Amino acid sequence: MNIVEMLCTDVIVYMMDYLSDIDKINFLKTCSSFYNHRFCVKFNDFHSFDKIRDLDYSENFKRIVFTKTKNNVKSFTLNNSYDRIPIDAKHLIIGKLFKLSLENIIPRGITHLTIEEEYGSEINPGIINPEEIPDIVTYLNIKSRNIFIKKGAIPDSVTHLYFGSDYLSKDIIPKNVVYLRFGDFSRCVIGQRLVETRQVNDITVTTTRIESYIPESVACLHLGFSMSNKCLGERIIETQEMDGEKINTTKIVSYIPKNVTCLTIFNEVYKNTFDFIPKNVTKLNLFGEIMEMIDETIIPKNITTLGLACYRDLNKIKIPKKVTRLNFLFEEYMSNPKVLDIPEHITTISLKYTHDIFKKVVFNNILNLKIDSYYFEKKLYLPNSIKTLTIYGNYDKKVIKKLPNTINTLIFKHK
């Protein structure tokens, strides 16, 4: 009898416990008899999902690495009128040195268009006219504050719009935009108040309504640093005069469309800020300074993801139990020796920038952590509760070696 046939499954599995994953695979491939035992062997090291997904025993791999790369669109920066735009370029960047009008400049093959901050400062006037931007462009990034955009200049094909200009009025933003981000230093307003007075049966009726410049199609809205709190909406006082007596009624109306589900605010946050947040918002980023204590009853009930500027803000806001994901934006070196607790109902934490937060914040039930790759340049601590780790950066084997054994899923995500 062949010695291979004498080894039962239990013996083979026991032997596998003393081998690395690579050695296990090499051993199983020695002969067909051993290979038939592959469904009984567990693999404990990290393996790329792309390499194991087609294996019939892929479920036996406990720790998996996912790599999410950014779509590479060929780009070209236009700085001079004599520059030749490549035929295969899809992303055109109007550089800071370009000083001409955009008329007859942008080829029809361009799907992504970026206009840099300095463009328009030396053009008098700095205007974008209709039909200058092709109706094939879907991603438009207007960084310049010096540009006046005429009605119809932004084509209906645009779905993702970064609006850095200070000048905005009705019907400038097309109705197909789903992602709208205003520039960090853009000072434009997003709506206006309209007052109408009329006589009804010898009664003077004053009606106030608002007109938002943001289309109903927008689902994700990002308001910049320099935009006033008045951008959120209006408190309207309507007055009716009956039998010589004036009756006032107050109505709160928001400039933010009802269909917005993701909202980012960089303004100072007060209790009345929440009066203008639509009920459909599920992801709310409060990246401005919180000026008052915020009770959980004030926060809209549908919010499941909450973003804060820094983890010190945990002292200023009581997070509702329905919120399961918490995002921190800024890095902060805490001088306060007090240790902060993350609420037990939070299961996912995302850290944009961070010092060694884990020395100052207690993580209770955090299963998912999202963090920048530079965090691993030092030997720093990760909570043992983490099961899924997302790293914003490129795939790095050195990082994998620093991770605790408790992590089962690792995701490298392009910034």
Swiss-Prot record:
Disulfide bonds, paired cysteine numbers: none
InterPro entries linked to this entry: FNIP (IPR008615), STK_FNIP-Repeat (IPR051251)
UniProt superkingdom: Viruses
FNIP repeats: 148-185
Pfam families the record matches: FNIP
Protein name as annotated: Putative FNIP repeat-containing protein L415
